[in-house]
UniProtKB/Swiss-Prot annotation:
Taxonomic source organism: Aeromonas hydrophila subsp. hydrophila (strain ATCC 7966 / DSM 30187 / BCRC 13018 / CCUG 14551 / JCM 1027 / KCTC 2358 / NCIMB 9240 / NCTC 8049)
Name used for this protein in its record: Protein Syd
Gene transcribed to yield this protein: syd
Membrane topology designation: Peripheral membrane protein
Coiled coil (residue ranges): none
Gene3D superfamilies in UniProt: Syd protein (3.40.1580.20)
Pfam families listed in its UniProt record: Syd
Keywords: Cell inner membrane, Cell membrane, Membrane
GO annotation, cellular component aspect: cytoplasmic side of plasma membrane
Length: 182
């Protein structure tokens, strides 16, 4: 499963880069001296830096998080969050505008893990099955999530608990994402 996720994510990033660079060149983001990333391509100019998603040489380790939660994160989630660094990536899924969530650097991965833990503990308190958010939507109460048990990708309404299956797996979801300009 991990290899399928990494391959599908790499193909999505290649499409995103090809489409974006054909339109406007490399994406730029604000440069922060104390928030560096292996995604940064050049030296900053006028407070901005060009960037690209960056595949990690070694996957991130989720052992401590798994042990703390007494829950094993789905292998697709571990591959997704632990395989690449990136800025949030705007995209479309069947007309739904969303921003894919990935860590920018190691410190951001730690923050993402904390947010995922908080999300999982909230779901546990509400007696809902565990899911891991992978993308945001324009509505802050609606997330795109990975079901930790089945690996399905859902549209999840946090306020009502309603869940709608978007794709049978993370690779299937990634293959159907449409790119948007950065």
């Amino acid at each position: 499963m991990s290899d399928q996720v990494l391959s599908a994510l790499e193909h999505f990033f290649l499409r995103w880069q090809r489409d974006g660079e054909a339109r406007r060149g490399l994406p730029l983001c604000e440069w922060e001296a104390d928030w560096r990333s292996p995604c940064e391509l050049d030296e900053p100019k006028e407070g901005r830096v060009a960037w690209r998603p960056h595949r990690r040489a070694e996957p991130a380790d989720f052992t401590a998080m798994n042990e703390a939660l007494e829950l094993t994160l789905h292998p697709a989630a571990q591959a997704l969050f632990g395989g690449w660094f990136s800025r949030p990536v705007p995209c479309l899924y069947k007309g739904l505008r969303l921003e894919f969530v990935l860590p920018w650097n190691e410190a951001d991965l730690d923050l993402l893990k904390e947010n995922l833990i908080g999300h999982l503990l909230m779901l546990r308190k509400l007696k809902r099955s565990p899911s891991l958010f992978i993308a945001t939507t324009r509505n802050e109460m609606t997330l795109v999530s990975l079901d930790n048990e089945s690996g399905q990708v859902w549209l999840e309404w946090l306020d009502s608990g309603r869940r709608l299956v978007l794709a049978p797996s993370l690779p299937a979801f990634l293959e159907r994402l449409e790119t948007l300009p950065q």
